[in-house]
From Swiss-Prot:
Bacitracin is thought to be involved in the inhibition of peptidoglycan synthesis by sequestering undecaprenyl diphosphate, thereby reducing the pool of lipid carrier available. Its EC number is 3.6.1.27. It comes from the Bacteria. It is found in: Cell inner membrane. Pfam families: BacA. Keywords: Antibiotic resistance, Cell inner membrane, Cell membrane, Cell shape, Cell wall biogenesis/degradation, Hydrolase, Membrane, Peptidoglycan synthesis, Transmembrane, Transmembrane helix. This is Undecaprenyl-diphosphatase. The chain crosses the membrane at residues 1-21, 39-59, 83-103, 111-131, 144-164, 189-209, 218-238, 246-266. It comes from Vibrio atlanticus (strain LGP32) (Vibrio splendidus (strain Mel32)). Belongs to the UppP family. One of its GO terms (cellular component) is plasma membrane.
Length: 267
């Protein structure tokens, strides 16, 4: 992998990981459209490290508060709203872990195609638009009980299908349940911390046992670029949705989906 490819793929990963437009789709497309080789396990781990660092550092106050409340609930019986939210985030992570382990081979074999990406990009974009326009948008993330957390967790599990978008699915589910746009995004971002950690750890274990070559320069490029782009993305996304809602991302998904269909039909 060249430094240019590493830079571009890390930039794409960072900007799309937390937007409702599917990071996996944008990482699959370069190989499908431009003929780039697969970036490999080591690079996957690197960009996971970068995006994880971005969300943890951006929400560092919330992360510290949630961790403190979680351990307080375990050892001291803390029943604060922060402790409840921490447990709900853990609950919401479980479905994706189960689905990921059970369905990953099927997804790899049958669903990582540009046709699937184009279809899911359009369908879930329209669903996001409908929910954003028709939901009550009144609750914050601390209103998430176990039923709501499980529902959002199931939506996150569905995002194993390329083109769906993890953040898109979870934000859509949270909006449907009555969360405000900002609360839906925050809950989605906080949910990303355990799932990115687990996914990165799983890929790291595979890397250790695979014997794949490691190029330090491209890996550092991946970490740094994905971190910076993800941090910037989180900051401006939260500001944008409070003013414009989800419409810009729906429009982008529709353009991407139909554009990809047009490209595929011309091949």
């Amino acid at each position: 992998m060249s430094y240019f490819e590493a830079f571009m793929l890390a930039l794409v990963q960072g900007f799309t990981e937390f937007l409702p437009i599917s990071s996996s789709a944008h990482l699959i497309l370069p190989s499908a459209v431009l003929g780039w080789e697969d970036q490999g396990l080591a690079f996957d781990v690197a960009v996971h490290v970068g995006t994880l660092a971005a969300v943890v550092i951006y929400f560092r106050k919330e992360v510290v508060s949630l961790l403190s409340a979680f351990f307080g609930s375990v050892f001291k019986g803390d029943r604060s709203k922060e402790a409840k939210l921490a447990w709900m985030i853990i609950l919401a992570t479980i479905p994706a872990c189960i689905f990921g382990l059970l369905m990953k081979d099927i997804v790899e074999l049958y669903l990582r195609s540009a046709w699937v990406i184009a279809t899911t990009t359009i369908i879930f974009g329209l669903l996001l638009w409908w929910v954003d326009k028709n939901s009550s948008l009144r609750d914050d993330e601390y209103q998430a009980g176990w039923k709501k957390a499980l529902f959002i967790g199931l939506a996150q599990a569905m995002a194993i299908i390329p083109g769906t978008s993890r953040s898109g699915a979870t934000i859509t589910a949270a909006l449907y349940l009555g969360f405000t746009r900002e609360a839906a995004a925050r809950f989605s971002f906080l949910m990303s911390i355990p799932i990115i950690t687990l996914a990165g750890g799983y890929l790291g274990l595979k890397l250790v046992t695979s014997g794949d070559p490691i190029h330090v320069g491209t890996l550092l490029t991946g970490i740094v670029v994905s971190f910076i782009s993800a941090y910037i993305c989180i900051h401006f996304f939260l500001k944008l949705i409070s003013r414009m809602g989800m419409t810009p991302f729906v429009i982008y998904r529709l353009i991407l989906g139909f554009g990809l269909f047009a490209f595929l039909m011309m091949q």
